[in-house]
């Protein structure tokens, strides 16, 4: 069993805490004037995305999480499973619960990062920016600019978001998957 001692806790490292894989988001070493030094850590549970703040003594250690990340290309879905392919042309399936809300940013042939723990997919991270086609939107009138400068648009993946009035059906747009917001039009 490999372990990290608390003085080796660094941002980005993955550990096992309370029998779950966690990502260290930040760590701060504190040496008080009186008493034992300690490390204040912010952990993100990889299974539930819950953020935890925890303090460890300088003598504590935690097991290293055997977590691996692979960049895979999305192929298709059958409603229950989402299928991806790696560079060796091996097909992998991921349950729709794991894909979750990220399904609205995945279109065929897009790459994404899938995180595995104990040979099971635990999370999917789509590209930060994706290019999607607008399949439905309202027609903007000249008088619409008085009250609002955006309208709702439905994208090829089913996602609905606010776009500027000049975006039309068939337009390709760039979307930020972290915030779910329109970034720019692609010409």
UniProtKB/Swiss-Prot annotation:
The modification N6-(3,6-diaminohexanoyl)-5-hydroxylysine is found at residue 34. May be beta-lysylated on the epsilon-amino group of Lys-34 by the combined action of EpmA and EpmB, and then hydroxylated on the C5 position of the same residue by EpmC (if this protein is present). Lysylation is critical for the stimulatory effect of EF-P on peptide-bond formation. The lysylation moiety may extend toward the peptidyltransferase center and stabilize the terminal 3-CCA end of the tRNA. Hydroxylation of the C5 position on Lys-34 may allow additional potential stabilizing hydrogen-bond interactions with the P-tRNA. One of its GO terms (molecular function) is translation elongation factor activity. It is found in: Cytoplasm. One of its GO terms (biological process) is peptide biosynthetic process. Keywords: Cytoplasm, Elongation factor, Hydroxylation, Protein biosynthesis. Pathway: Protein biosynthesis; polypeptide chain elongation. CDD domains: S1_EF-P_repeat_1, S1_EF-P_repeat_2. It comes from the Bacteria. GO terms for cellular component: cytoplasm. Belongs to the elongation factor P family. Involved in peptide bond synthesis. Alleviates ribosome stalling that occurs when 3 or more consecutive Pro residues or the sequence PPG is present in a protein, possibly by augmenting the peptidyl transferase activity of the ribosome. Modification of Lys-34 is required for alleviation. NCBIfam families: efp (TIGR00038), PRK00529.1 (NF001810). This is Elongation factor P. It comes from Buchnera aphidicola subsp. Schizaphis graminum (strain Sg). The gene is efp.
């Amino acid at each position: 069993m490999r372990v990290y001692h608390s003085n080796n806790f660094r941002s980005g490292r993955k550990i096992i805490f309370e029998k779950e894989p966690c990502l260290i988001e930040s760590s701060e070493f504190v040496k008080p004037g009186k008493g034992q030094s300690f490390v204040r850590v912010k952990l993100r549970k990889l299974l539930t995305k819950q953020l935890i703040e925890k303090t460890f003594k300088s003598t504590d250690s935690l097991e290293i999480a055997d977590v691996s990340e692979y960049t895979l290309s999305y192929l298709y879905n059958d409603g229950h499973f989402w299928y991806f392919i790696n560079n060796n042309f091996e097909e992998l399936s991921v349950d729709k619960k794991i894909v979750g809300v990220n399904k609205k940013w995945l279109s065929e042939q897009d790459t994404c990062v899938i995180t595995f723990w104990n040979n099971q997919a635990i999370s999917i991270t789509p590209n930060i920016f994706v290019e999607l086609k607008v399949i439905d939107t309202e027609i903007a009138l000249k008088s619409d600019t008085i009250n609002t400068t955006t309208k709702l648009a439905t994208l090829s993946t089913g996602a609905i978001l606010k776009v500027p009035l000049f975006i039309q059906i068939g337009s390709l747009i760039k979307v930020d998957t972290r915030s779910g917001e329109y970034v720019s039009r692609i010409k």
